[in-house]
Structures are given as structure tokens and as C-alpha cells.
């Protein structure tokens, strides 16, 4: 006797559409997100798989204006350095990219991995401790899909110095910085990645290696 939900063709089609329309969003409206929705997103993230059921993700909600200012300043510094690393012929194209929504996104989450957690009792981590951080990324992706299903957009800001973020948010030393997420109502929706539309990088078919 079936006890779980029925994932019928209609559901699968909707799920496929969710994957296609999940975008890395940089352009947000400033409309607030209600607290019930925020709580639901974090609850969905907690449903993600994790090595040894360790749930090592730690979400820090960044509301304080001064702390957000530190993040913006750090992005500005890191982005200038990253642009300088590009070949000269690509630097102007890089400068035209909008790589963050730090000034617009109403909800901002810094995501860390608790490298000292005893939850899970180390199961599956002895030979591959990096699976803890992989687990955090799974939680981020789960939250991302949950947000998109509710009409929200998510932008992952990676042009940041982890030590600066960790210090600015005053988190335990055992927490390793993984991601800074900007979340809000997108100004536009598109099934094609912005970097592809701007000519920076198109998607490529995924090769499958068989042995």
C-alpha cells in the first residue's frame, strides 16, 4: 500500500520547470519577505541530505546595516582584484557584469559549515571530511529551489574574502565560510542564465564518462 505522495507526470514536469527557471539572481526588488516564508525556506534547507545526518550547515541572517556595509566594502575590494586577474581583453566585459545584489536584496544569509559538530558522530567523514561542506552546499541548493518555487530569487556571492566575512559576523572559529546568499523578489525572470545572455559563458552539454 502506498504511504508516500504520488509524484505523477504533472509533478515531474513542474519539477523540471523549477530546475530550468532556477537562476542566480542579481537584480532584486526591495520588497520585504514575510517572516513565515523565511522560516519555511530555512525549514526546507534542513531537509537536505548530509553526511552521517550531521546537518553541519549554519545560517547567519545578516540584518545589521553596518555588517552589511563591511560585506559590500569587501566585495568591492575583492571584485577589483578579480577583474585585474582577467586577461586584458576580458576586463571590460567583467566590469559590466553585476555579480551581487548586496544593496537590494532584503534577505541576506551567510552560510557556514560547522567543522567541529559532533552530530553524526563522524560517520562518513574520516576519509572525506570535505563531505561536511558538500552537505552544506546541498542545503543551499535545497533552499534555493524552495525559494524559487515561491517566486523568490537567490544570488550566491562568492567574490568575498572568507576571513573578512567570518570576522564581520563574529562567528565561532570552527565555522568555515561557504556562501553568502542574497534573496529577494527578482526584477525579471528568465530560463537562460544571465552570464549566457551577456555572452560571458554559455552552458555546455554534460559529458558522461563510462568505464
Swiss-Prot record:
Its EC number is 1.13.11.79. Pfam families: Nitroreductase. FMN binds at residues 22-26, 50, 99, 158. It comes from the Bacteria. Disruption phenotype: Cells lacking this gene fail to synthesize cobalamin. SUPFAM superfamilies: FMN-dependent nitroreductase-like. Changing residue 22 to E: Completely abolishes DMB formation. The keyword Amino-acid biosynthesis does not apply. One of its GO terms (molecular function) is nucleotide binding. Keywords: Cobalamin biosynthesis, Flavoprotein, FMN, NAD, NADP, Nucleotide-binding, Oxidoreductase. The keyword Nucleotide-binding applies. It catalyses: FMNH2 + O2 = dialurate + 5,6-dimethylbenzimidazole + D-erythrose 4-phosphate + H(+). Belongs to the BluB family. Involved in the biosynthesis of cobalamin (vitamin B12). Catalyzes the oxidative fragmentation and contraction of the isoalloxazine heterocycle and the cleavage of the ribityl tail of FMNH(2) to form 5,6-dimethylbenzimidazole (DMB) and D-erythrose 4-phosphate (E4P). NAD(P)H is only required initially to reduce FMN and oxygen drives the oxidative fragmentation. Homooctamer. This is 5,6-dimethylbenzimidazole synthase. It comes from Rhodospirillum rubrum (strain ATCC 11170 / ATH 1.1.1 / DSM 467 / LMG 4362 / NCIMB 8255 / S1).
Amino acid at each position: 500500500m502506498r504511504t508516500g505522495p504520488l509524484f505523477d507526470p504533472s509533478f515531474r514536469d513542474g519539477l523540471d520547470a523549477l530546475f530550468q527557471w532556477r537562476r542566480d539572481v542579481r537584480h532584486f526588488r526591495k520588497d520585504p519577505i514575510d517572516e513565515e516564508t523565511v522560516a519555511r525556506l530555512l525549514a526546507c534547507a534542513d531537509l537536505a541530505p548530509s553526511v552521517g545526518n550531521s546537518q553541519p550547515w549554519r545560517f547567519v541572517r545578516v540584518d545589521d546595516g553596518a555588517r552589511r556595509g563591511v560585506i559590500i566594502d569587501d566585495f568591492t575590494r575583492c571584485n577589483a582584484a578579480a577583474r585585474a586577474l582577467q586577461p586584458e581583453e576580458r576586463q571590460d566585459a567583467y566590469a559590466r557584469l553585476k555579480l551581487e545584489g548586496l544593496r537590494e536584496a532584503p534577505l541576506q544569509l551567510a552560510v557556514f559549515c560547522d567543522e567541529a559538530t559532533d552530530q553524526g558522530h563522524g560517520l562518513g567523514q574520516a576519509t572525506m571530511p570535505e563531505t561536511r561542506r558538500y552537505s552544506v552546499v546541498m542545503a543551499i541548493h535545497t533552499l534555493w529551489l524552495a525559494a524559487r518555487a515561491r517566486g523568490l530569487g537567490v544570488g550566491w556571492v562568492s567574490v568575498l574574502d572568507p576571513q573578512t566575512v567570518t570576522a564581520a559576523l563574529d562567528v565561532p572559529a570552527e565555522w568555515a565560510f561557504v556562501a553568502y546568499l542574497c534573496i529577494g523578489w527578482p526584477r525579471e525572470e528568465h530560463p537562460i542564465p544571465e552570464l549566457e545572455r551577456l555572452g560571458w559563458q554559455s552552458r555546455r552539454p554534460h559529458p558522461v564518462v563510462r568505464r
